[in-house]
């Protein structure tokens, strides 16, 4: 299988030495009592500044994609080779005097190269740059020593100054009046330090009691929330980005795919048609993805409360049921708790289900498990990858691009002579799409910059690219697959190929069984480090997804819509496109209303009240009178069988 497991070592040891620690191993084994003492020290003599909370973020962006792995959102200087505007904030110190300064950061390209560092930045205190340049040491998240600063006032302006435009990142800045203090590297101790120094973020506020809480604001979650709200439910939609749409937002820029308004429920998809963009194409200008259209549709619903920039990362259980979900604001650290009798996991990564102990699958099943001819003989960890798309635009004059030292080794044989990277710029197959996702995204950035630098500075055809400038490179990677929650039924290849339709069929999937693999040509050039993929298609007859695939087998009040539903890896190839996931959301919202009507769980809807759900699916929750604009990228399909 494809892998980036290149055996490169981190620079953690170097960082530890730079921090002049007498015994790092003792530090990593601090007892709970030590942490408590540290907390007392911290409150009196230290200040911790979370970068994502900066009052003025300038040109830096908040990146929350990996906070469950590395501990926090962070600020990133995503300038595509042009330094971004400074981020600034005001910091209050407990007293004047000298402070040791530490910055938690990383040299994100050090895993692949030891030549220079891409994401260099400085920290300015009251306009004066602290001596070290940051982002130059460890390939992993670690503290970089900033030396000692002299604070002449108890209030100071602290700024982050980007030096390169190449994704420098800052998690947190720590000031300590103890000249011998060393901050913890251990994840649990660091989390405790954050709580001690920012006690306001410890309190969990009541976010409200709802009939239905939807986690994840992609097409699936947005449609689920609107659908339920229109049927009279009090709904919360919790989304960890500032926009809605997920992969179809302007942050990722993947166009919608699949067909809507199909039998046996031709009004399913009206809501997708209502909120979906009218233009097709991947990696296109911002306006094509109509973020405002989705946002306005949600804000128009009086029964729907929207919580943007809240990342759900904790569940409270009672009697094997989800009682509430806790979410953290990705900028302020504020924590809210949302209570409801019913929840929907539309996160894509099955985040809520996994936290709740729901059964899930990952990787490829073997061919015998579900009797699938397309599946491998032996199960493995291969998943479809994530895309870092990009495009360039023409300018009136020549535009330079840095000849980067930290680029991957490139030549004419490796060069991609393109001005747009589409879906097939795909990385991470064979890696954990959750635990290793920052590495996956960063490799996607690295190959885009390496290729573009070569085209602009060394290619034999560089004249063609002289007036081209990178207009957009995704820093939110477009993910296809990670974890799939297990429902009362697991959809499999034979159901689709043999068209075994079940009585609880709902939203129809029409896309081909579309599975991605490393491009063999790219493998020859980048063995084990591929960044391009191929798609292998197997067409199907439009197939109604069983409702039993849309709720958890062992968490009774949890439903799901999107790419994390109950399907095999092979079956995921068809259901994962966004018009299909949007229709799943419509159905899940309808099912939530049936649950409330009959005071039952999703399994009860299947067993006793499915006719109620049928009637809602026949009627739909979208506006049927709107022009049908979802007529692009519908995909190949086989004609429906005659009944």
Region spans (language model):
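Extracytoplasmic
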Residues: 43-205
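Bacterial Sec-dependent N-terminal signal peptides
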Residues: 1-43
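Flavin (FAD/FMN)-binding glycine-rich loop and adjacent Rossmann-like elements that form
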Residues: 199-202, 206, 247, 309, ...
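Conserved N-terminal/central alpha/beta ligand/cofactor-binding core
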Residues: 233-234, 239-318, 361, 384-392
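N-terminal Rossmann-fold NAD(P) dinucleotide-binding loop
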Residues: 221
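Beta1/beta-strand and adjacent pyrophosphate-binding region of the FAD-binding site
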Residues: 206-218
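Aromatic pocket-lining residues of Rossmann-like dinucleotide-binding sites
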Residues: 228
């Amino acid at each position: 299988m494809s892998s980036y497991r290149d055996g490169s070592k981190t620079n953690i040891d170097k960082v530890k030495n730079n921090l002049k620690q007498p015994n790092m191993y003792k530090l990593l084994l601090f007892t709970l009592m030590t942490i408590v003492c540290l907390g007392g020290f911290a409150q009196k003599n230290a200040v911790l500044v979370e970068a994502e909370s900066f009052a003025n973020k300038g040109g830096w962006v908040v990146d929350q994609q990996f906070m469950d792995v590395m501990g926090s959102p962070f600020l990133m200087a995503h300038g595509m080779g042009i330094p971004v505007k400074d981020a600034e904030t005001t910091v209050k110190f407990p007293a004047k005097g000298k402070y040791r300064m530490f910055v938690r950061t990383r040299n994100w390209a050090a895993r692949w190269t030891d030549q220079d560092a891409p994401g260099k930045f400085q920290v300015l205190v009251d306009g004066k740059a602290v001596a070290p340049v940051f982002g130059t040491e460890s390939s992993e998240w670690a503290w970089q020593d900033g030396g000692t600063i002299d604070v002449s006032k108890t209030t100071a302006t602290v700024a982050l100054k980007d030096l390169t435009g190449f994704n420098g990142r800052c998690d947190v800045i720590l000031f300590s009046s103890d000249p011998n203090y060393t901050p913890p590297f251990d994840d649990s101790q660091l989390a405790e330090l954050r709580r001690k120094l920012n006690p306001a973020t410890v309190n969990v506020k009541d976010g409200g009691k709802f009939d239905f809480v939807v986690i994840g604001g992609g097409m699936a979650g947005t449609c689920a929330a609107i659908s339920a709200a229109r049927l009279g439910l009090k709904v919360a939609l919790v989304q960890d980005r500032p926009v809605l749409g997920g992969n179809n937002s302007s942050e990722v820029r993947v166009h919608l795919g699949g067909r809507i308004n199909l039998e046996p429920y031709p009004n399913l998809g009206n809501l997708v048609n209502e909120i979906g963009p009218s233009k097709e194409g991947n990696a296109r200008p911002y306006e094509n993805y109509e973020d405002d259209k989705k946002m306005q549709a949600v804000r128009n619903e009086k029964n729907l409360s929207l919580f943007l920039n809240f990342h759900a990362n904790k569940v409270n259980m009672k009697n094997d049921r989800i009682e509430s979900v806790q979410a953290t604001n990705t900028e302020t650290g504020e924590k809210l708790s949302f209570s409801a009798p019913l929840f929907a996991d539309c996160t894509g990564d099955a985040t809520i289900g996994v936290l709740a102990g729901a059964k899930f699958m990952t990787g490829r099943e073997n061919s015998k498990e579900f009797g699938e001819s397309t599946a491998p003989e032996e199960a493995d960890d291969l998943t479809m990858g994530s895309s870092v798309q990009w495009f360039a635009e023409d300018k009136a004059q020549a535009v330079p691009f840095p000849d980067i030292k930290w680029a991957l080794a490139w030549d004419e044989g490796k060069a991609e002579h393109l001005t747009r990277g589409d879906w097939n710029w795909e990385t991470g197959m064979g890696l954990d799409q959750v635990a290793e996702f920052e590495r996956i995204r960063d490799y996607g950035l690295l190959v885009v910059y390496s290729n573009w630098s070569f085209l602009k500075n060394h290619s034999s055809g560089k004249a063609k690219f002289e007036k081209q400038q990178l207009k957009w490179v995704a820093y939110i990677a477009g993910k296809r697959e990670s974890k799939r929650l297990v429902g009362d039924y697991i959809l499999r290849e034979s159901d689709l190929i043999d068209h075994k339709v079940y009585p609880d069929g709902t939203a129809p999937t029409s896309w081909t069984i579309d599975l991605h693999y490393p491009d063999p040509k790219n493998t020859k050039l980048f063995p084990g480090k591929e960044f391009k993929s191929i798609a292998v298609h197997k067409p199907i007859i439009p197939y109604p997804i069983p409702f039993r695939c849309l709720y958890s087998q062992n968490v009774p009040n949890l439903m799901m819509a999107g790419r994390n539903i109950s399907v095999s890896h092979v079956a995921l190839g068809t259901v994962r496109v966004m018009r299909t996931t949007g229709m799943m959301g419509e159905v899940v919202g309808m099912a939530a209303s049936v649950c409330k009507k009959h005071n039952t769980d999703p399994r009860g809807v299947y067993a006793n009240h499915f006719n109620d759900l049928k009637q809602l699916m026949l009627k739909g929750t979208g506006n049927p009178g709107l022009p049908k604009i979802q007529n692009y990228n519908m995909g190949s399909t086989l004609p429906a069988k005659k009944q």
